[in-house]
C-alpha cells in the first residue's frame, strides 16, 4: 500500500511539473491566452514548449531504461551509458557525420551515431568479459577509461578539422534548441523502451550468468548483444537531439532499486 501511494504521488508530481514547465520560458505564455486563441503564443507553445517537454520525458525515460539494461546485463550497478562509453561513442558518430556528410540531416547524423554507439558498447562489454578481475569498481573504471580514449579521439578530430564549435552542441546536454521538426528522432525511444520490456525477463536471466542462461535454454550472446543494441540506440537517439545527458542512466536505476 505504501509503495502504491508513493507511486501515485510521484506520478502526480511528474504530471504537475510537466504542466508547469509548459509555461516557463523567455516569452510568457498563460493558459488563458491559449484558451482564447492567441495565435502567437499558441504557435510558440506547439513549436517550442510542447516539443521541449516531450524531449525531456523521452530523455529521462530512455536514459533510465538504457542504464537499467546495461546494469542488468553487465551484473554491475555502476555501469551506465556514461560509464560504458556509449555516450562517448555516439558523440564520435556525430562528429564523423559532420566530417563526411556536412549537409547531413538529423537522420543522417543519427545513423552514424547509432553505428558508433552500438560498436563502442559491444567493444566495451567484450573487453570486460576478457578481464579476469571483475570487482565492482573495476568494470566502470574500464568503461570510463575507454570512454575517455574515445572522447580524446573525438576532440582531436574536431580540433584538427576545425569542428570544435560545431561539436560543442552535443558535448553538453540541453533542451534550448529543441523545436518542432528538429527533435522527432527522439521518439525512437518509445518503441525501443517497449521492446526492452518485452525482453525484460530474458535480460534478468542473462544477468544471472552464462551457465545459468544456457541451462534455461536462453541464447546468452544473442540476448546480451540485443540488450546492448537497444541501450545503445536509445542513448544515440537522445545524444543526437539534446546532446550528452550524463549519469541519469546511473543514478535513476539505483535510486529505484533502493526504494523497491
Give, region by region, the residue ranges found by the protein language model.
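Alpha-helical transmembrane segments in inner-membrane proteins
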Residues: 1-260
Amino acid at each position: 500500500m505504501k509503495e502504491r501511494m508513493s507511486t501515485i504521488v510521484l506520478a502526480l508530481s511528474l504530471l504537475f511539473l510537466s504542466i508547469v514547465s509548459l509555461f516557463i520560458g523567455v516569452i510568457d505564455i498563460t493558459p488563458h491566452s491559449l484558451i482564447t486563441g492567441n495565435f502567437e503564443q499558441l504557435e510558440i507553445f506547439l513549436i517550442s514548449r510542447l516539443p521541449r517537454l516531450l524531449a525531456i520525458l523521452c530523455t529521462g525515460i530512455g536514459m533510465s531504461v538504457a542504464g537499467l539494461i546495461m546494469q542488468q546485463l553487465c551484473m554491475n550497478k555502476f555501469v551506465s551509458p556514461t560509464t560504458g562509453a556509449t555516450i562517448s561513442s555516439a558523440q564520435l558518430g556525430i562528429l564523423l557525420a559532420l566530417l563526411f556528410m556536412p549537409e547531413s540531416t538529423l537522420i543522417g547524423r543519427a545513423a552514424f551515431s547509432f553505428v558508433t554507439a552500438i560498436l563502442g558498447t559491444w567493444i566495451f562489454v567484450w573487453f570486460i568479459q576478457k578481464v579476469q578481475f571483475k570487482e565492482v569498481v573495476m568494470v566502470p573504471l574500464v568503461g570510463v577509461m575507454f570512454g575517455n580514449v574515445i572522447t580524446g579521439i573525438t576532440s582531436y578530430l574536431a580540433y584538427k578539422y576545425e569542428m570544435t564549435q560545431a561539436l560543442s552542441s552535443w558535448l553538453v546536454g540541453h533542451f534550448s534548441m529543441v523545436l518542432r521538426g528538429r527533435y522527432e528522432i527522439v521518439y525512437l525511444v518509445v518503441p525501443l523502451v517497449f521492446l526492452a520490456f518485452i525482453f525484460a525477463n530474458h535480460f534478468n536471466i542473462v544477468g544471472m550468468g552464462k551457465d545459468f542462461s544456457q541451462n534455461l535454454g536462453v541464447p546468452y550472446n544473442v540476448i546480451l548483444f540485443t540488450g546492448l543494441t537497444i541501450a545503445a540506440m536509445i542513448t544515440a537517439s537522445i545524444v543526437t537531439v539534446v546532446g550528452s545527458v550524463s549519469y541519469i542512466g546511473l543514478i535513476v536505476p539505483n535510486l529505484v532499486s533502493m526504494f523497491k
